[in-house]
Amino acid sequence: MSEPLLHVVLYQPDIPQNTGNIGRTCVAVGAKLWLIRPLGFRLDEKHLRRAGMDYWQHLDWEAVDSWSEVRERLPDRRVWCLTKFASRMVWDAEFQRGDILLFGSETRGLPESIRDENSANNLKLPMHDVVRSLNLASTANTVVYEAVRQFGGLT
């Protein structure tokens, strides 16, 4: 398999439908999806079908036990943490092929220790204060396609 365009990492995702939508985006652009356990759902065939992931066989993905395991496997990759606590906007980043886009769980976000470790590369999408957070799949799709836009497309 060729080198992934991006590495999309979901830290302890809770909702299978969000993971399914993000997986579909990864297939569409040639990104690899990493899932960090524990997950809020099972990865068996029945649950994947229920989440609409019938294309799962086309997805380059891996489930691992920790963020440190991802870093050990991808030591030289630049990490972008998506968090509402960031001061920089997604549009201010200059993405590179092979970057890691790290997203927290729907209910807890990313641990502060991970955000602090990558503080120079914490990014957010703009939103009014009355909105607590954006949907994980919507955010991931927006950020992935901003990177694709910066790359000049998929070619």
Q: In which residue ranges do the predicted regions lie?
A:
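Post-transcriptional modification and biogenesis factors for structured RNAs
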Residues: 1-155
